[in-house]
């Protein structure tokens, strides 16, 4: 890796660094820093630098700066000129000539005929290509500073000078092909294009890189194009055809190519530099071989500069450190100068030693040198195409020396020629063999270049849980190949947010009211949209980077090992085994070396290596996600900053636009950047707010308070009353809509008043509306069908005016709206009745026609004139009412005088209803009635909110009901008035106190008195009428109620019957299914038990047969044992009889159980027919499940089995003991008898034959009987009984063996007696067998009858 040195600079971070002539130059945003061994110097730039290159041939720096201009500086940092070279006054032509965005790449061109490009150019031989993020490539003439051409894929727009200037994807990489005169560019959309230098058109594209910006473009000395991209690949292209030759996977953020050594230095974002060689094999195929990787232990690398003469790399990292890597390749420049040495190096490899290289001394002749050079050219055709001036001078000097020595050494030359020819031929063969061996080793042994560079350290934040989640996620990605689905959901949310922000921002720009600033607003709008587009591009690039990283991570060997360990291991083992066989076939001696390789390669699957690799892969997944989240956070902050710079922000969330309407002064349009919805912002001075929540109040999202003001964030409105009225035909609202609006307003005011709040400034501009349209029905007339009925949703706003009933009115802001204010407002008194007055004025506004609205209802130039207009329309108040108003409110002296003035005004000639009808001619009687009750001068005489909601007009009742409702309300009001007006003495004293007034005033008072008296009488009469009407209505209601109740009861009964039928049917079906299932289960259980018992009986029979066979064999062997066999058979017969009796008892018990079950079923069926269906569903299920399954199956069976088994065991044991004793005694007696009765042997033979015949008959009869018994009866388990039976068998065998040793004399004496007993027993057995058969037949008949009954019962239950 060489010696690595690091240094740093103060101030801004560096952009790039260069090393030449023993001077290190570091370029930052501010300028140039020059370092050597003794001093340090700084030269500032004209503007902040965004990109810089060093032109070695021109010894100058070329920069792209923040003002989109290109500037040239000398190698010492002194300023030269700028491109374009224009005067200080900036015009629109400057914008057309210069770049429109930041310059990202610069590339100088020399030794090109400018007349091939532009006929107007001079004879200068220096040009410059520049590419910017505006998507254009511009060709400059350096000496004059003029623009020659612009290259772009879009030719739809042309400037006045014929220069193409449009925007597209940003240019991120540039290079120039001098042979074909092609400008090759890479853009941010991942496409590489080649442009004709002369025609300025696109000649083709290089397709292969996936989506992502092209980072680097280089031209090799072999005429190929080398590119790197954000897709983490490096590719080699054929420029003519545009096809990809080869490539490797490595992320190269910046890249440098050395023509002399044919080596590429690729620096990544992880602080590593890959040294890659471009190699051509014998088959003329090209490949990129990674020689080594230099790990600088630094962060991301921004820039590389390679000095080919000293073999030194200057590295600029993202931090302020500048690293210097000496002996980067280990190949000195002197070896590169010499062609012969260079060829040997290329053959043997850059990493091999140079001890065996051939060298030619200066004394060798010119001919030998020519021959050696020709042979070397045959070995490798790729020679250097350019040689600097120093190399040419050295060659000329060598040629002169060789010519001088040529004459002196002709003889030596001939000898040396032959020697050199032979030596070179041998060396040629050796080199060819070495190349072939190296190729084979590289194909078999060389590891592939990893396309993914893993991190050097494992993150401490990596947990076991995240490791498992990461591996599972990578497995899903590998299986589905859908890496895009793994992106964070916030990614798509960001893109959707940008789209919505664009829409909301454009909407704000469109609502700008000033026409003079349209051009300025359009420019702001364009800049706003372009900024959001750049954010979207950044998000796409970020997601593509993440996708490419994850894809490359999945394709790595380590990921394959972790994700598919078994399969990968199997593949690896198979490949290794295949190599093993090949190596064995080639050479047996290589087996040991290969075994070591096998162990090494399989070690990655060991318990030690596999967890480390797993952590490494999971760590990369974790780091990728972490980078993604950090990028998202940074973009989110940038978006927030961008929005704040574009629109004023409240609480860094709500961005303000223009005023929401022309009449509004403190309400602005805005949008919420978090929830992405439009909002309205109300600006208020710092006052206390009490914001209630109701469906008819504008929804408040948030209240933001500052020391200077309060910002109320609320939902925006669509329209108000005035635009709604103007949108109607003839500016007239339908009555249904008026009722809907009034009802909603009353409900909203009722809520506010119940919360001790008064709206205070209710007027049409405060009533916001949202409308929805519904088409009329087909049954309506044709004219009405064409109209649309609008449904209105009312929203009250303006919370700054709303105040608490306990608040101080002077502390709150006052606004215009006195036309809609009540009379007490002039006295600065606020109560709930004030809102009723304002709502009445709005009610008139809704009912008026277009002409009537031109004249305001209450008008005047001052407070007195307004009071006069109020008195003219609603009537003059009484003095006592004024006194009451003054006493109830804390009024100023001016307000008191104003109210006294209202009481002193003359009484209007016309009635208030007539006055109101003149201002709203289309109002109905019920509407006018509601208006008169709302527009009462005295607050406590106005109608309440509850009464207004129950008014006939609001309820939209028919006329008769309206009249009745009006009469009731009038009675209630008259009762209240009587309590206030009577006693008459008070009114008379009030009248007498004013005798000094004019005659007209006294007459008015007398008229008012007469009116009051007449009204009182009318009220009394009306009360009686209403009382009678109420009685009649109550009687009618009672009758109607009774009829309705009867009808409802009948309907309910019918519905209940129908429902009960349905429930019954469902219950029946369920019961049937359950009974069928249970019967099937019982049958299956019985069958299983029968099968088990049959098997057990078969086993018993087999045991019996075995016993018989054993006894027969013993009889054949010894005649003495014949009598014993008969005795054993008798014992067995007795045991069988006992077993039969027990089994019969068991059968009877089981039959009784079955009968019990059937009885239970019958009882259940009877109960089903009697009980209700709802109880049947529960009881039947419980009884069937508990009684049948648990009690019958478990308890009965278990008890019976245990009792039978215990009884059998005890009885068999006792009988076996008795039998064994008897047998022993009998055997002794028989032996004695045998001795005595030897003479009777002939008789015994005959007896034996008869016994055998009888045995066979008995056995045959038993077999037949047992088969019938097994098929028709149910017996208990006999597994334990079998084990018990084995006991007496063993005892009998023991007894038999003991009896063999007894005397044979007893056997003879008792033989006759035994024969007699056998005959008697046989007769008894025959009789018993007959009885058993008869009993079995009877039981079979009973079972058949019972089965028939069960089937009949099931059929009946199914029918039920």
Curated annotation (Swiss-Prot):
The UniProt entry, under SUPFAM superfamilies, shows:
Protein kinase-like (PK-like), WD40 repeat-like
| Gene3D superfamilies named in the record | Transferase(Phosphotransferase) domain 1 (1.10.510.10), YVTN repeat-like/Quinoprotein amine dehydrogenase (2.130.10.10)
What residue stretches are annotated with the Protein kinase domain? 636-954
Acidic residues bias locations: 1301-1311, 1331-1354
Q: Does the keyword Ion transport apply?
A: no
Q: Which InterPro entries match?
A: Kinase-like_dom_sf, Prot_kinase_dom, WD40/YVTN_repeat-like_dom_sf, WD40_repeat_CS, WD40_repeat_dom_sf, WD40_rpt
The WD repeats are at 44-83, 109-152, 166-205, 208-247
Where do the TM regions start and end?
none
Q: Where is the composition biased (Basic and acidic residues)?
A: 1291-1300
Q: Region labeled Disordered — which residues? A: 959-989, 1258-1311, 1331-1360
Gene Ontology molecular function terms on file: ATP binding; protein serine/threonine kinase activity
Query: Which stretches are tagged as biased composition: Low complexity?
Result: 959-979
- Coiled-coil-forming residues are 1014-1269, 1297-1352
What are the record keywords, sorted?
Coiled coil, Repeat, WD repeat
Q: Which family does it belong to?
A: Belongs to the protein kinase superfamily. CMGC Ser/Thr protein kinase family.
Domain statement: The protein kinase domain is predicted to be catalytically inactive.
Q: What is this protein called?
A: Probable inactive protein kinase DDB_G0270444
């Amino acid at each position: 890796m060489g010696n690595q040195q690091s240094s740093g600079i103060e101030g801004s971070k560096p952009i790039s660094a260069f090393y030449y002539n023993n001077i290190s130059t570091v370029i930052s945003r501010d300028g140039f820093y020059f370092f050597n061994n003794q001093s340090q110097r700084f030269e500032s730039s004209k503007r902040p630098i965004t990109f810089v290159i060093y032109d070695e041939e021109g010894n100058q720096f070329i920069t792209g700066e923040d003002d989109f201009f290109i500037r040239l500086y000398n190698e010492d940092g002194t300023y030269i000129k700028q491109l374009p070279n224009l005067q200080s006054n900036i015009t629109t032509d400057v914008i057309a000539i210069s770049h429109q965005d930041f310059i990202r790449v610069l590339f100088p061109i020399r030794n090109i005929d400018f007349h091939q490009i532009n006929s107007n150019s001079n004879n200068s031989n220096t040009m410059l290509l520049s590419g910017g993020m505006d998507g254009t490539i511009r060709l400059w003439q350096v000496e004059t500073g003029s623009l020659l051409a612009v290259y772009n894929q879009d030719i739809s727009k042309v400037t006045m000078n014929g220069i193409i200037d449009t925007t597209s994807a940003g240019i991120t990489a540039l290079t120039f092909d001098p042979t074909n005169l092609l400008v090759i560019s890479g853009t941010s959309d991942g496409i590489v294009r080649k442009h004709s230098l002369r025609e300025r058109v696109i000649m083709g594209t290089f397709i292969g890189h996936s989506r992502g910006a092209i980072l680097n473009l280089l031209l090799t000395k072999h005429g190929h194009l080398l590119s790197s991209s954000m897709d983490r690949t490096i590719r080699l292209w054929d420029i003519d055809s545009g096809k990809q030759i080869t490539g490797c996977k490595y992320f190269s953020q910046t890249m440098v190519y050395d023509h002399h050594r044919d080596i590429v230095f690729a620096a990544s974002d992880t602080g590593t530099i890959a040294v890659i060689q471009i190699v051509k094999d014998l088959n003329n195929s090209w490949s990129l071989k990674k020689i080594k990787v230099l790990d600088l232990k630094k962060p991301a690398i921004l820039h590389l500069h390679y000095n080919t003469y000293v073999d030194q790399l200057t590295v600029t990292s993202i931090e302020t450190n500048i690293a210097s890597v000496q002996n980067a390749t280990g190949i000195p420049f002197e070896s590169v100068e010499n062609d012969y040495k260079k060829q040997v190096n290329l053959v043997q490899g850059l990493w091999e030693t140079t001890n065996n290289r051939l060298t030619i001394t200066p004394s060798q002749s010119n001919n030998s040198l020519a021959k050696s050079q020709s042979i070397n050219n045959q070995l490798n055709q790729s020679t250097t195409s350019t040689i600097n001036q120093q190399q040419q001078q050295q060659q000329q000097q060598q040629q002169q020396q060789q010519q001088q020595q040529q004459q002196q050494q002709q003889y030596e030359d001939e000898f040396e020629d032959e020697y050199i020819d032979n030596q070179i031929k041998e060396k040629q063969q050796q080199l060819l063999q070495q190349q072939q061996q190296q190729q084979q080793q590289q194909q078999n042994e060389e590891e592939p270049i990893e396309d993914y560079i893993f991190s050097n350290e494992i993150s401490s934040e990596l947990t076991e849980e995240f490791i498992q989640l990461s591996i599972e996620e990578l497995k899903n990605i590998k299986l589905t190949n859908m890496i895009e689905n793994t992106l964070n959901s916030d990614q798509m949310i960001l893109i959707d947010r940008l789209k919505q922000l664009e829409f909301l921002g454009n909407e704000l720009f469109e609502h700008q009211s000033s026409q003079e600033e349209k051009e300025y607003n359009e420019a702001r709008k364009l800049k706003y949209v372009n900024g959001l587009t750049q954010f979207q591009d950044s998000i796409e690039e970020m997601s593509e980077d993440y996708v490419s990283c994850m894809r490359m991570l999945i394709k790595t060997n380590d990921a394959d090992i972790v994700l598919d360990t078994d399969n990968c291991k199997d593949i690896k083992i198979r490949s290794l085994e295949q190599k093993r066989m090949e190596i064995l076939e080639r050479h047996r001696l290589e087996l040991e070396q290969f075994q070591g390789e096998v162990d090494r390669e399989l070690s990655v699957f060991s318990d030690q290596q596999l967890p480390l690799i797993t952590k490494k892969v999971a760590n990369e997944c974790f780091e990728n996600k972490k980078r993604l989240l950090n990028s998202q956070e940074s973009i989110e902050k940038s978006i927030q900053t961008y929005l704040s710079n574009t629109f004023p922000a409240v609480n860094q969330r709500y961005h303000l636009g223009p005023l929401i309407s022309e009449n509004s002064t403190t309400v602005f349009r805005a949008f919420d950047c978090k929830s992405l919805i439009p909002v309205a912002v109300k600006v208020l001075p710092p006052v206390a707010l009490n914001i209630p929540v109701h469906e008819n109040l504008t929804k408040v999202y948030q209240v933001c308070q500052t020391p200077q003001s309060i910002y109320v964030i609320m939902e925006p409105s669509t329209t108000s009353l005035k635009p709604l009225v103007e949108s109607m035909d003839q500016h007239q609202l339908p009555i249904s809509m008026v009722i809907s609006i009034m009802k909603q307003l009353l409900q909203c005011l009722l809520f506010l008043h119940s919360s001790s709040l008064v709206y205070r400034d209710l007027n049409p501009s405060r009533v916001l509306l949202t409308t929805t349209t519904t088409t009329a029905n087909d049954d309506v007339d044709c004219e009405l069908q064409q109209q649309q009925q609008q449904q209105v949703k009312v929203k009250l706003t303006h919370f700054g005016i709303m105040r608490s009933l306990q608040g101080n009115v002077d502390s709150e802001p006052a606004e215009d709206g006195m036309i809609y204010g009540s009379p007490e407002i002039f006295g600065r008194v606020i109560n709930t009745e004030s809102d009723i007055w304002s709502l009445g004025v709005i009610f008139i506004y809704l009912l008026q026609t277009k002409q009537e609205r031109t004249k305001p209802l209450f008008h005047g130039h001052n407070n007195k004139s307004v009071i006069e207009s109020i008195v003219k329309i609603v009537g003059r108040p009484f003095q006592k009412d004024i006194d009451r108003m003054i006493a109830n409110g804390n009024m100023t002296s001016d307000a008191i005088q104003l109210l006294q003035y209202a009481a002193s005004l003359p009484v209007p000639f016309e009635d208030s209803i007539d006055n109101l009808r003149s201002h709203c001619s289309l109002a109905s009687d019920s509407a006018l009635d509601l208006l008169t009750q709302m527009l009462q001068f005295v607050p406590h005489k106005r109608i309440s909110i509850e009464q207004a909601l129950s008014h006939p007009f609001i309820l939209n009742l028919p006329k008769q009901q309206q009249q009745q409702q009006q009469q009731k309300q009038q009675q209630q009001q008259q009762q209240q008035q009587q309590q206030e007006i009577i006693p008459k003495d008070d009114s008379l004293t009030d009248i007498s106190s004013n005798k000094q007034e004019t005659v007209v005033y006294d007459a008015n008072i007398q008229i008012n008195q007469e009116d009051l008296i007449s009204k009182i009488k009318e009220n009394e009469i009306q009360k009686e009428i209403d009382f009678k009407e109420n009685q009649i209505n109550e009687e009618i209601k009672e009758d109607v109620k009774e009829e309705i109740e009867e009808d409802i009861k009948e309907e309910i009964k019918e519905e209940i019957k129908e429902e009960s039928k349905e429930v019954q049917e469902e219950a029946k079906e369920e019961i049937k299914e359950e009974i069928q299932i249970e019967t099937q289960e019982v049958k299956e259980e019985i069958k299983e038990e029968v099968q088990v018992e049959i098997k057990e009986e078969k086993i018993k029979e087999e045991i019996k047969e075995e016993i018989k066979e054993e006894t027969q064999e013993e009889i054949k062997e010894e005649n003495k044992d014949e009598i014993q066999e008969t005795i054993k058979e008798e014992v067995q017969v007795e045991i069988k009889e006992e077993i039969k009796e027990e089994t019969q008892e068991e059968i009877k018990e089981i039959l009784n159980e079955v009968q019990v079950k059937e009885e239970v079923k019958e009882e259940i069926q009877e109960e089903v027919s009697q009980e209700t269906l709802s109880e049947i569903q529960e009881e039947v299920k419980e009884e069937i499940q508990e009684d049948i399954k648990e009690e019958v199956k478990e308890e009965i069976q278990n008890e019976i089995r245990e009792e039978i088994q215990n009884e059998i065991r005890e009885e068999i044991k006792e009988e076996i003991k008795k039998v064994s004793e008897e047998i022993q005694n009998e055997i002794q007696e028989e032996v004695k008898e045998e001795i005595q009765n030897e003479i009777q042997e002939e008789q015994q033979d005959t007896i034996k034959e008869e016994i055998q015949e009888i045995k066979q008959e008995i056995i045959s009869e038993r077999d037949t009987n047992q088969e019938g018994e097994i098929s028709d009866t149910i017996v208990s388990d006999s597994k334990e009984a079998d084990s018990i039976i084995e006991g007496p068998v063993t005892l009998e065998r023991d007894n038999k063996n003991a009896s063999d040793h007894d005397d044979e004399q007893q056997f003879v004496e008792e033989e006759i007696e035994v024969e007699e007993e056998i005959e008697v027993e046989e007769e008894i057995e025959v009789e018993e067998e007959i009885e058993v058969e008869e009993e079995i037949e009877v039981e079979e008949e009973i079972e058949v009858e019972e089965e028939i009954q069960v089937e009949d019962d099931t059929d009946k239950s199914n029918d039920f």
